[in-house]
Amino acid sequence: MDKQDEKKQGTTKSSSTLTTRCSHGNHISQSNSIPLDITIEILSRLPAKSIVRSRSVSKLWSSITTTPEFIKHRSKKTSPPCVLLIFRKHDKLIVFSSPQHQNTYSHVQDYHIEIPKNGFIRRLDSVHGLICLEGSKQLVICNPTLKRFFPLPEPQGTGDEYNVGGFLGYEPIEGKYKALCIVRGWNTQVLTLEIQESWRVTKPGYTHWPTKDTGRCINGVIYYKAIIFDRVPRHVIFGFDLRYEEFTHIEFPMRNYDRFLMVSYEGRLALISSTSSVVEIWSLEDAGNRKWSYEQFHLCLPPNTSLKGVIDAGELIYTGFSLNRSFCVVYFDPKKNNIRETKFQGIADNQIWQPDRLGFDLVNDFYVLPNHIESFISF
């Protein structure tokens, strides 16, 4: 075989193609072959709903769209971050999604997700497209894009009663999801998702228990409020580095820490407190030296609004305490001293408005998750 023929053969072998066949009675005709990379490109350009549906249409498409290569490729084409408004009603999560940079009126997309048995909500946050729910003895991962739940293995030493607290994190350098679990306050364990492995025991240095507040994953570190059971119990902020799997703890920069919401602000850990007229922001400037900075801003908000979070652009998110015919979300930019509103259409017509024997509580049954992105990952 000469070099030219060898080159042609090598080219043929390295070229992956997708061949489709059409059957008419006993006659089978072969259509033009579609290169695999073109198929991936076509599928990656589809809307999220279409990609999810394609998995049930074709086994080949299902295998393609579940590979790490496709998921990584699709993430580069993902839609802009959105804000999720999640209402819990009985065993359902009613989820509304809308672009968080849209002004005036926004028509929301909504869908319902059945909560698995023994799954309940105490802390809720969107971590790189996934949401973590706490079960009685295990953690459950929810992918809103796929509308699916993925129960994690039960941690070691859970016993018969509820004693599990946990958080989900994303390590951006290695691109890995990890779950952190605290069992009975002294047994801390970590699990790498996507890998068939068991929980690994870690040592935080202190016996502690997370508070009911939501944790935050910022630049590969899970931060959460906790109580250290030392000689005198005290409240601190724990940090868990996902890459090196090491713990640190940080003292609060103020005494009245209960009224401060822990968020990611300008890419850093921050504690924010807000009334209708004043916003206070403590930002962790230097985690190694425990150095905080303090800022105060004045604003004029509508009455009966509550701070729910911060979007990546630095705007603070507020919502009301009641459901009106046009549900409104208020955004405040402290740096620009600018306020904008988005009124959501479609929420008033949803079944959360239907009469309910148990009623509905916007304080305990309503969650706002900013900076949510699409994810096609499954476990």
Swiss-Prot record:
Region (Disordered): 1-26
Gene3D superfamilies membership: 1.20.1280.50
Occurrences of domain F-box (ranges): 28-74
Polar residues composition bias: residue spans: 11-26
InterPro entries assigned to the protein according to its UniProt record, in alphabetical order: F-box-assoc_dom_typ3, F-box-assoc_interact_dom, F-box-like_dom_sf, F-box_dom
Protein name: F-box protein At5g18160
Species, as recorded: Arabidopsis thaliana
